[in-house]
Amino acid sequence: MGVACYARLTGDESCTAQAKTMAAHLLEKIGDKGNTPLTLDGQGWSMKYNLLWDKVLHLGLLPDSFYAAETASYLPRINTYGLPLDSRADYTKSDWICWTARMADDPAVRAALIAPVAKELHETTSRVPFSDWYDTKTTRLVAFIGRSVQGGLFALML
């Protein structure tokens, strides 16, 4: 992603081609059927929130079919209060859920990802400014209080 962004900023077409080649190699390893692994050895899973910028900046690194399959693969993993960051724990980051929702073109997938974040905000027992890092099963605050990263909640407006 970073290589493609710098290539665009500098107008370096060879660097753009290199970024697209790297993305193509990645797709060869992981496929475009969704459910990409947490690590390249195929273990676990994770939200691919940083891929948001491929969609927002129209870099064209990965096909729309990849994003549709990947975001749909998250739906069965959503807990009461949101999608965990990855398969290692039940905590999440609300801003990154919104980044992930922005990658989905399907409004139903977006809504399914966003609704639990709103539910957490309404039902949390934590009496602090909106924490971006919380447990998706209990709403328990993990850390981080009232941080500016919550601007990521507006990712759907990009």
Regions found by a protein language model. Name each.
Residues 1:
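A structural signal for conserved, well-ordered secondary-structure elements
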Residues 4-17:
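Inter-helical turn/loop segments and adjacent helix faces that build the functional surface
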